[in-house]
Amino acid sequence: MATSTTGSTLLQPLSNAVRLPVDQVNFVVCQLFALLAAIWFRTYLHSSKTSPFIRHVVATLLGLYLALFCFGWYALHFVIQSGISYYLMIIIGVENMHKYCFVFALGYLTVCQITRVYIFDYGQYSADFSGPMMIITQKITSLAFEIHDGMFRKNEDLTPSQRCLAVRRMPSLLEYLSYNCNFMGILAGPLCSYKDYITFIEGRSYQLQQSEANGKEDTKYEQTDPSPNIAVAQKLLICGLSLLFHMTITKTLPVEYNIDENFRATASWPVRVFYLYLSLMAARPKYYFAWTLADAINNAAGFGFRGYDKNGVTRWDLISNLRIQQIESSTSFKMFLDNWNIQTALWLKRVCYERATFSPTIQTFILSAIWHGVYPGYYLTFLTGVLMTLAARAIRNNIRHYFVESPAVKLCYDIITWMTTQVAISYTVVPFVLLSVKPSFTFYSSCYFCLHIASILVLLVFPLKRTQKGNKQHESIQPVWSKKLEEENLLQKNSYSTTNNSFSQKEEITCRYQALKQ
């Protein structure tokens, strides 16, 4: 565990008191400060009280201050990466800038990850400057593709989601830095579309279309400013429970104990499997805490409103990154992945899967692995994950229909698939936590590579059925990201244009309404 930081050491006494690395304490305290700043931002710098210019300046300066406090001079990487990417956008032009920005941003991130891991602090599993750079890389590449779509490609060549997200004018440098480095998302994200962010900063009114009871479309224009207080309070409660769990239970269930020689020699197989599940389940609350707190910060500032449901209840999950209940109750590999790190899955689909001219599945998994980092354990997890995903899909496609007719039988099937999914997920992500090759292979060899072998046997026995609706150029084996076409509209229904003068108001309302219907 890390005991030093490149950022401020002002909170070292607090770090000693709570027995956490000072860089992690800096992260939590800065996020709590960002939460208070978000409330202040929404109250005193509301779009009705000040100009977008002031909101951009304040959001950017606060973000850079938090970055400097947490990471010291390493925070300059955020500005350098953003600045060079913006320069590339300007000098190269809209036809090819998305390619150059993609290669540069991902390459710069990879170089920083290599230097951090193999030169400075291999194995430190704490807050580090490459984490925010991963989010900034997503934003840089997403915006580059969105500008390319909006300013170069023909409207009829775009998919519905690309049409909704397309940016029709070049952002100013201030807008660009504000989008990449604002205080709400500088430390933990999550990714959001540029148009959603600009809509929030400029305080554009929501134009809602709802369906009347008789099925006719009723267009309503509302100047809405719903309160996020309830949503923020609920998410802070989740953060508190997650942090309490992490501080108490997680420390008693280390993942490393799965490869302890004495434990492997003395524990029975049921005990080992049960501990495997418990230890990996206990490793998740820190992600629940970080991502839910980041979501709450954005909501507190007034960002993240996704509209109203059919009952008129506000929804504040536009940029939510996970769904905890669905994760813990997942009965399939796909269901788990669909609800984990949602915004990253959508980014992979937007910039890679739907644009790949060949082998979109392979290209998407490669991009995901490169983006996550350079620890060997990450690649072992992704390779194992591919195998598990294919095997799970083969089983589901070939046998599930035998168990859905009877409620009692389906309940038994769901229980069995839940247990299997949780164990398979835990088995798959052990290298992601252990990081290195040797301990990862120690774990897998102690399990005799049982789930790897079982997955291969499943693929040999059960055929992989082709998706009837699949495009002929896509593989029959599609990753979870390719199946989020409808979900993206659901999550991105605030993505109507604020920068497009040529994109008609009627088209934008239709874009939003189609998302609301789902």
UniProtKB/Swiss-Prot annotation:
Enzyme Commission numbers on file: 2.3.1.-, 2.3.1.51, 2.3.1.23, 2.3.1.n7
Record-linked InterPro entries: LPLAT_7/PORCN-like, MBOAT_fam
Class of enzymatic activity (EC top level): transferase
Pathway: Lipid metabolism; phospholipid metabolism
Primary location recorded for the protein, binned into one broad class: endoplasmic reticulum
MF terms in GO: 1-acylglycerol-3-phosphate O-acyltransferase activity; 1-acylglycerophosphocholine O-acyltransferase activity; 1-acylglycerophosphoethanolamine O-acyltransferase activity; 1-acylglycerophosphoserine O-acyltransferase activity; acyltransferase activity
Membrane topology: Multi-pass membrane protein
Active site positions: 341, 372
Subcellular location: Endoplasmic reticulum membrane
GO process annotations (BP): lipid modification; phosphatidylcholine acyl-chain remodeling; phosphatidylethanolamine acyl-chain remodeling; phosphatidylserine acyl-chain remodeling; phospholipid biosynthetic process; regulation of chondrocyte differentiation
Record carries keyword Membrane: yes
Keywords: Acyltransferase, Endoplasmic reticulum, Lipid biosynthesis, Lipid metabolism, Membrane, Phospholipid biosynthesis, Phospholipid metabolism, Transferase, Transmembrane, Transmembrane helix
UniProt-listed Pfam families: MBOAT
An annotated GO cellular component: membrane
Sequence intervals crossing the membrane: 21-41, 60-80, 87-107, 183-203, 230-250, 267-283, 365-385, 415-435, 443-463
Purpose: Acyltransferase which catalyzes the transfer of an acyl group from an acyl-CoA to a lysophospholipid leading to the production of a phospholipid and participates in the reacylation step of the phospholipid remodeling pathway also known as the Lands cycle. May catalyze preferentially the acylation of lysophosphatidylethanolamine (1-acyl-sn-glycero-3-phosphoethanolamine or LPE) and lysophosphatidic acid (LPA) and to a lesser extend lysophosphatidylcholine (LPC) and lysophosphatidylserine (LPS). Prefers oleoyl-CoA as the acyl donor.
Family named by the database record: Belongs to the membrane-bound acyltransferase family.
Protein name (Swiss-Prot/TrEMBL): Membrane-bound glycerophospholipid O-acyltransferase 2
Organism: Gallus gallus
